[in-house]
């Protein structure tokens, strides 16, 4: 698996160039590289990647509005107040310094944001599934699209959950809003409900 680590390291420069691209489509070559990463992640089991600390992290994503982010098999994204919910257990894949992709473990889908700022679950790891993870002064993280921002102000689109748990369009978000502030929380196997605990012990 050292090959995978080396491969991820080789794409740092390309990924770091995302913010400067705005709405311009990424090159076919870069999308192809993301596809290769996706393929290698799908072939690998949890134990295969266990030693790659910092590349693959299993977490819940808690929003300051009181909800954990969930990715459902039908591609919808929503928030839940349930701790260790089935669709709220996520894998954070570190692609480069400060750049991550987030995948729902049970749904097998990647968190994506389209040009309208809408969140969705994607079967493929594409450029819309790469986010800039930034540690803020209040100890929370923000997750900004690396592709989409307001053309007039340059303000990025952020992942956000409203006060009712529904996803807010990234085009309607600002960095200082509490609905854009998240805490990645550790996953503890013993806290996962028994009904679906085995799903995560072997993934």
Curated annotation (Swiss-Prot):
It is found in: Secreted. GO terms for biological process: cell population proliferation; cell proliferation in forebrain; cell proliferation in midbrain; diencephalon development; fibroblast growth factor receptor signaling pathway; forebrain development; GABAergic neuron differentiation; neurogenesis. One of its GO terms (cellular component) is extracellular space. The keyword Secreted applies. Its main location: secreted. Disruption phenotype: Fishes shown a severe reduction in the size of the pectoral fins. Keywords: Growth factor, Secreted. InterPro entries: Fibroblast_GF_fam, IL1/FGF. PROSITE patterns: HBGF_FGF. Disulfide bonds: none annotated. GO terms for molecular function: fibroblast growth factor receptor binding; growth factor activity. It comes from the Eukaryota. Belongs to the heparin-binding growth factors family. PANTHER family: FIBROBLAST GROWTH FACTOR. Plays a crucial role in pectoral fin bud outgrowth. This is Fibroblast growth factor 16.
